[in-house]
């Protein structure tokens, strides 16, 4: 995967449009979590040191082409001032005369943040005219947002047709980490895929069985595989209408010599809530009225044995109903074991997706994985083997 990076760009005195992801939680006009702002600091500082005039582009939430005052990026500008230690200029537009005036006034090293891109319907339509209008404000373009690179949007894809385009440092670091996960990994490779519904990850599973040596399936989605193997799963979450597709994954795994690792025991209760009575049982003994809420100790031990045999681990999704104690135990136990292996240098560990990040933070080991991606949809599409539009655009720009 080859594309130009900002290290190759002459940015001195240039207007540099930087696509960032400042889609952050806000409450009462203030940013609640600066994590995503911090991720882009390295790229912004690198451009500053080399004399660039920096114009930041971002979306926030889903205003669907309408101006929604509570989704304005003005509070983000204030939060960014604290992080950067300098004034951040802000314009309540993305294109037009006010933006042009603000850009013309920028000095080298100064930063301008434009308004929420998704206040414009044309952004999500990948509209060429809107992309060209954005491009007129800059001399070159930098994509620093892996988390939006699965979107063929105007500020991600179409804009690259109008400006020389480069990868920022956060994007470059993410792609390098992911390459170690599935594209060019050390073997054996294990993928852990969990979550509630198998319907949301069938494409991921179909791709992974052709790429990994072991595929661990947990969470509610594992119930479908257990049912496909003839097990009773009681009242557990399941999607019977997808049974043929699940059986196809099982067959494809067999043909690809990928070992499927499914729960062999479980923690079972009658309801999915804190304080509900629960007990341990083997998969063969799930009661008709029971719900599988977490993996059991035998399953944890089996997964840890697979991790012991792995040089690369890719993880997306929890292994039980981790939001409800004590059904977070399986996810926490495996996460801590994987983190310890990674810290000792025994495996490269890569995890991603919103629930996964939350779960690993909950387990206290998020910082112990080799790489943790905050991207949700982009991470899943990478796991599906798709080439992301934002990354493809940078690769094509290099060819041109």
Swiss-Prot record:
- Taxonomic superkingdom: Bacteria
Report the principal subcellular site: cytoplasm
Localisation per UniProt entry: Cytoplasm
Q: Does the keyword Cell inner membrane apply?
A: no
The gene from which this protein is expressed is pgk
Q: What is its EC number?
A: 2.7.2.3
Family under the similarity heading: Belongs to the phosphoglycerate kinase family.
Indicate what this protein is called per its UniProt record: Phosphoglycerate kinase
| Record-level Gene Ontology MF annotations | ADP binding; ATP binding; phosphoglycerate kinase activity
Quote the catalytic activity from the record: (2R)-3-phosphoglycerate + ATP = (2R)-3-phospho-glyceroyl phosphate + ADP
Residues annotated as binding ATP are 201, 323, 353-356
Q: What Pfam families does the entry give?
A: PGK
Record: residues binding substrate: 21-23, 36, 59-62, 118, 151
Task: Tell me the Gene Ontology biological-process terms attached to this UniProt entry.
Answer: gluconeogenesis; glycolytic process
